[in-house]
Amino acid sequence: MKKLEGKVALVTGSSQGIGQGIVLKLAEEGADVVINYRSHPEGAEATLAQVQAIGGNCFTAMCPKSMGYTIQADLGSVEEVRQLITSSIEHFGKLDILVNNAGIEKHAPFWEASEADYDAVMNVNLKGVFFATQAFVQHLIETKRTGKIINISSVHEELPFPNFTAYCASKGGLKMLTRNLSVELGALGITINNVAPGAIETPINTKLLNDPEKLGALLNNIPLGRLGQPKDVASLVAFLASEDAGYITGSTFFVDGGLLWNYQEQ
């Protein structure tokens, strides 16, 4: 029996990159998965096709034969966040695992950052996570079940990142949200943890990948000497979503090749 067989997982922002990798790994471990996207339906459908290729059975005769389902939602809108949770439950009948992966960043010197950009980052990276988690926990309480919450943070919950101050603040907030909820939700049998990736080879880093000088400088800061892959993050998420991690909560796990302890600002 696979570790996540019979479980249903929602992964926000999962049409590409790290989120896509997480969806595929959870499906490989037997979970049915909800693939969320904001503005990339083609990526969501491509992810769904890969999930369907993995195979597997639904846990009820009423649900589709595939293991996957796509839902559009903007995580910067609380109304859409709540509807995303509701639609996921309506489709599969329940939710067991929530992976808060969706995130955005805005580049600007601190003294030039606009209120609109600040709000955009905070709404997705922190506010959206807060209310998605709240709706998920309400579902677990109503159905008298336990569950797993995994937040995708960043090494920048600890590392300064000049010109991305709002992003760093959002990830620092996510760290404390996780710690606080581990205490508040522990008695309910609900665990919550952060996974903090470093430099991962994804579409969001295309500009970096095409700049040999900057890429070389970054690699010199990574003791393992390479960029991470989505599967590096996904494997840890799958572990934290399983019963093998039943006694782990309130922690941040860095997936960064050692970058955090060897970082020198370029």
PLM regions with names:
Residues 109-110, 114-122, 218:
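Substrate-binding pocket helix/loop in short-chain dehydrogenase/reductase
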Residues 111, 159-165, 187-188, 225, ...:
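Active-site loop immediately N-terminal to the catalytic Tyr-X3-Lys motif
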Residues 133, 170, 178:
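Active-site helix of classical SDR
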Residues 138, 183-187, 246:
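Alpha-helical segment proximal to the catalytic Tyr-Lys
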Residues 154:
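Residue(s) in the substrate-gating loop at a strand-loop-helix junction
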Residues 159, 238, 249-266:
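Short C-terminal tail/terminal secondary-structure segment
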